[in-house]
């Protein structure tokens, strides 16, 4: 993105809340009514074509449970407990959301040199407007000021990056890293034998310490992969170099 296109931070929260559905940008369309109709039609028409569901309310509850976990490690057992159906059913339903482009399963980065990496994927909602409607965050202001603002911010950034690859006809070469010591890197983009580490922070005061986990990447063999400078995507309104190999970028650069 170019400097003149940067959005003010409050506009980002409007976009996060509004979501991606083009019709929502027509002034006459009510956000709440639109998403209620969208979910109802999606389950009645699309889901029922793909699988047998006994209860629309169960599937709606499932979508709410997934939306509430956007950006978290996918724990099928926990979701099954919330919804009151079997783990196998949750796995099947998650596959349907994937096929429909409603969620994305972000795989953990795998490399023999990073021994402690966990192997569970994370799940992300690809439309933060739908995520907000399902979890009843009804205005941009409540999202921005609420306890889940980091979750919405991260989901928005990840979905924007995923869509940018899709728009170029590419399968996103993106991963995350977390290990058994709770060290984590939000996103790793592996492209042309180069790793691009990204941290996503809702803060407007980015610091070098926020990217400390990037040091783990030095364990990777330099003859196989090169490590690009790290990036912290955040709410500070300008591009800011925090170190020679670390830049903080405004979310509006996406």
Residue positions per predicted region:
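Domain-level recognition of nuclease-like catalytic cores that cleave nucleotide substrates
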Residues: 1, 235-254
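Accessory nucleic acid-recognition modules appended to NTPase machines
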Residues: 25-195
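Switch/connector loops and helix/strand junctions flanking conserved nucleotide-binding motifs
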Residues: 133, 207-209, 239-243
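Arginine/glycine-rich "motif VI" loop of SF2 helicases in the C-terminal RecA-like domain
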Residues: 166-167, 215-226
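Active-site ExK catalytic segment of metal-dependent nucleases
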Residues: 190, 195-206
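Short, hydrophobic beta-strand segments that form beta-sheet elements in well-ordered domains
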Residues: 226-234
């Amino acid at each position: 993105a170019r400097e003149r296109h940067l959005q003010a931070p409050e506009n980002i929260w409007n976009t996060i809340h509004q979501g991606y559905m083009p019709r929502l940008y027509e002034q006459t369309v009510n956000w709440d009514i639109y998403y209620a109709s969208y979910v109802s039609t999606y389950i009645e028409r699309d889901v029922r074509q793909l699988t047998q569901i006994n209860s629309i309310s169960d599937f709606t509850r499932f979508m709410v449970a997934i939306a509430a976990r956007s950006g978290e490690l996918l724990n099928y057992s926990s979701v099954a407990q919330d919804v009151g159906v079997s783990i196998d059913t949750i796995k099947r339903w998650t596959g349907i959301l994937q096929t429909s482009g409603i969620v994305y399963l972000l795989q953990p980065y795998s490399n023999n040199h990073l021994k402690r990496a966990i192997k569970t994927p994370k799940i992300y909602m690809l439309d933060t407007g739908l995520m907000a409607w399902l979890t009843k965050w009804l205005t941009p202001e409540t999202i921005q000021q609420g306890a889940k603002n980091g979750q919405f911010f991260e989901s928005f950034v990840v979905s924007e990056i995923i869509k940018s690859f899709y728009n170029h006809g590419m399968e996103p070469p993106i991963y995350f890293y977390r290990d058994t010591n709770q060290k984590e890197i939000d996103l790793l983009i592996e492209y042309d034998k180069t790793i691009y580490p990204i941290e996503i922070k809702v803060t407007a005061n980015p610091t070098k310490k926020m990217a400390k986990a990037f040091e783990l990447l030095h364990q990777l063999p330099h003859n196989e992969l090169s490590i690009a400078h790290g990036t912290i995507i955040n709410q500070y309104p300008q591009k800011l170099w925090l170190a020679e190999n670390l830049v903080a970028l405004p979310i509006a650069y996406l």
